[in-house]
A protein has these predicted regions:
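A generic short-segment signal for beta-strand/edge and adjacent turn/coil regions
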Residues: 1-2, 13, 31-38, 83-88, ...
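Short, acidic/turn-prone active-site loops that include or flank metal/cofactor-
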Residues: 2-8, 70-73
Length: 166
């Protein structure tokens, strides 16, 4: 058995605070990392079926959020996965859809988050272009402009994300 540490830890001057995610695994966690300055924060929020109010509250105030944008719902529903797996992925304990991610990104931009990396994309049920489009269209519809109000990148397994300065 592996014990899950729910306490804050410090490594090289960074404070790392785990938080619970909504996923069908034992003790799924995301992380808020506070920089050496004690102010600048980043979050990693993947393997979550939906963004709970608690999760949103926890990552509010982060300058950078690395967030799951796992699947396009239409691709998932018409794709090769059996219905039982589709149902699990679409559940509150599955994975975050592009649209649900876009909703979270919009809420976070409204609260001051400026940098996003869309992550944990399904190879079978998503494309980087669809993930990017869902978030940027939602942000545009609320009047946010890319490179003014936010910077958004898509992480893929094939390419490194590069260094992001916040």
């Amino acid at each position: 058995d592996i014990a899950v540490n729910t306490d804050d830890i410090s490594i090289a001057g960074l404070n790392i605070k785990p938080f619970k995610t909504s996923h069908d695994c034992a003790d799924g966690r995301g992380y808020v990392i506070t920089g050496c300055d004690g102010v600048t924060k980043a979050a990693i929020a993947t393997d979550t079926g939906y963004v709970t109010p608690e999760l949103l509250s926890t990552i509010t105030g982060c300058k950078l959020v690395y967030i799951e944008s796992n699947h396009d719902v239409d691709m998932l529903r018409t794709g090769p996965y059996p219905f039982t797996l589709q149902k699990r992925i679409l559940s509150n304990f599955g994975h975050l859809s592009n649209d649900a991610c876009a909703d979270a990104v919009c809420a976070l931009v409204n609260k001051g988050t400026t940098h996003f990396v869309l992550a944990h994309l399904s190879k079978e049920n998503n494309t980087p272009e669809l993930a990017y489009k869902a978030s940027t269209e939602a942000l545009c519809s609320m009047g946010a402009l890319e490179n003014r109000d936010y910077i958004l990148k898509v992480a893929t397994p094939e390419n490194e994300s590069g260094i992001i300065t916040v």
